[in-house]
């Protein structure tokens, strides 16, 4: 696929899907696509379908136009699925993918199975938002589109610190800055700023963390009861696994939070040796070499034990 515009020439309706529990790259890339279509293809009706997005992303142009339900029975001419490695990731919104006349997947997960009619998948790229930049004509990237793309890149690179960050990533970030975006505000207010309760729950997670595999792995978890006590939601737990990862001499960081009794969301980060994407796929998840996750059943301790057993094979 050369440019996104080549797919829009003969369509009237477009659905844009991201993944459940949308993060910065998901929200940023989806809204970048939406803004591009609504700005330069006014005759095309475009709709983003996502679960409710974190409030920190509400400043992005079009965030108030995101549809959070799948009640409408619409057969779209084109369905673009972004930042999703398989057909489970969009959740209930996958109905629009299944009924669309043509489907496209734009993604950067190594576990992507190329499930659409057209698949634009590059695992070596830092983020789906970076991919979106390459699919748009630079002269048509408005300040609003640039804000969306920059936000996505910032969040999936950990503010340009993860190994997926490349020279091209930095070059693209510079071009986005030239569009006049308030890049310091985007970084401070969407990545670093935390509420008091977010800091408290992170503090608990760090205090409760334990070392495994002779110090090569650090893990922690929070329960539904913990989230209720600290008055936070799953979307407020961003950053905990990254903070665990920077512990000295740690190779693998695990963070789990309880989705429902007996079921946890697992996030994994590694530094140099462990391919967490391979581990995630083993347990029905997916992701990248250094960042991956899965939904798993069992107690937190049992899940940590299973992950450590797989990681040990790579560390030997």
Question: Where do the model's predicted regions map?
Answer:
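Short N-terminal binding/cap micro-motifs at the start of the first secondary-structure element
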Residues: 23-27
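Active-site cofactor/cluster-binding pocket
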Residues: 61-118
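Hydrophobic helix-and-loop "lid/oligomerization" segment in the mid-to-C-terminal part
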Residues: 2-18, 28-58, 72-78, 158-316
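Solvent-exposed alpha-helices and their adjacent loops that cap or buttress functional pockets
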Residues: 71-74, 95-98, 112-113, 141-142, ...
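Short alpha-helices
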Residues: 106-172
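Short glycine-rich anion-binding loops that position phosphate/pyrophosphate groups of nucleotides
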Residues: 20-22, 84-87, 109-111, 224-225, ...
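Hydrophobic/aromatic residues located in beta-strands of well-ordered beta-sheets
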Residues: 46-48, 103, 149
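Generic enzyme active-site microenvironment
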Residues: 17, 21, 81, 105-106, ...
């Amino acid at each position: 696929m050369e440019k996104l515009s080549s797919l829009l020439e003969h369509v009237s309706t477009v659905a844009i899907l991201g993944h459940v529990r949308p993060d910065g790259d998901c929200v940023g890339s989806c809204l970048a696509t939406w803004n591009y279509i609504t700005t330069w293809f006014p005759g095309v009706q475009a709709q983003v379908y996502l679960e409710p997005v974190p409030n920190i992303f509400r400043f992005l142009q079009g965030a108030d136009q995101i549809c959070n339900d799948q009640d409408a029975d619409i057969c779209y001419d084109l369905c673009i699925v972004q930042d999703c490695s398989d057909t489970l990731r969009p959740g209930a919104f996958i109905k629009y993918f299944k009924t669309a006349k043509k489907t496209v997947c734009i993604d950067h997960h190594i576990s992507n199975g190329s499930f659409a009619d057209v698949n634009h998948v590059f695992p070596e790229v830092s983020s789906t938002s970076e991919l979106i930049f390459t699919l748009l004509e630079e002269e048509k990237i408005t300040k609003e589109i640039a804000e969306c793309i920059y936000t996505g890149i910032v969040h999936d690179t950990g503010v340009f610190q993860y190994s997926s960050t490349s020279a091209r990533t930095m070059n693209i970030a510079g071009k986005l800055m030239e569009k006049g975006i308030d890049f310091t505000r985007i970084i401070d207010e969407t990545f670093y700023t935390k509420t008091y309760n977010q800091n408290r729950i992170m503090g608990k997670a760090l205090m409760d963390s334990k070392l495994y595999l002779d110090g090569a792995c650090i893990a922690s978890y929070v329960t539904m009861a913990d989230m209720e006590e600290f008055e936070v939601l799953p979307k407020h737990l961003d950053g905990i696994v990254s903070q665990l990862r920077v512990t000295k001499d740690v190779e693998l960081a695990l963070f789990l939070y309880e989705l429902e009794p007996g079921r946890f969301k697992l996030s994994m980060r590694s530094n140099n040796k462990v391919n967490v994407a391979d581990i995630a796929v083993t347990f029905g998840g997916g992701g990248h070499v250094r960042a991956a996750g899965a939904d798993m059943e069992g107690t937190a301790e049992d899940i940590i034990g299973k992950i450590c057993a797989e990681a040990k094979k790579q560390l030997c």
